[in-house]
Amino acid sequence: MNYPVYLLELDENGNTKYGLQDIALVESPAYQSSFVKFDEQKLNFAIQNEEKQIVMGAVMIPDKMIYREENGKPFYVVANKETIYEASQKFNSENRNLNVKATHETDTNLSDVFIFESFITDENRVQKVKGFEELPYGTWFVTMKVNNPTVWEQVKAGEFTGFSLEALFKLKPITTLSDDEINTLMSIIDYIKCPLNYLLNTLK
């Protein structure tokens, strides 16, 4: 079976409808990169009998192909470093750090849950993140404070294991690939961290 592959893009003309709306706590994140719970790391300058209730994880990973299906038609989407950078800037400039949901099935933000840190790894500033060393440069991370006791219990119980973004992107068709080609590309990207656009050009 052949699958179309689309590149995620923001609108070049600054159309405000495009971009990230919120970040949800979910059981199965699209990027398959669960967040790290910092409750096990006790600092000396802290009340050691209480949890910090902080989670951190990846929101977007460059060149990671994600399976999607709409109206019964399967396809893949992928974001490059440039789009991820633009999306993170837009999300933060619009002060969306309180836009945190429990799954995407609700329109209500969680109370007492907020994002207080957001960064993108690169060769110069933040090279690697402990627990996520395998993720490539250009990965967007957020750190979230969970003061809501009900939500925190759900995090500890494993009901929420990662982040999932809710966003509207333009889809730019870049190629069509078979099952075998997709599996090969994913294996190469994961193994040598090679940008997807470079690999696609070598196939032409």
Which positions does each model-derived feature cover?
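Signature of dsDNA virion morphogenesis modules
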Residues: 1-194, 198-202
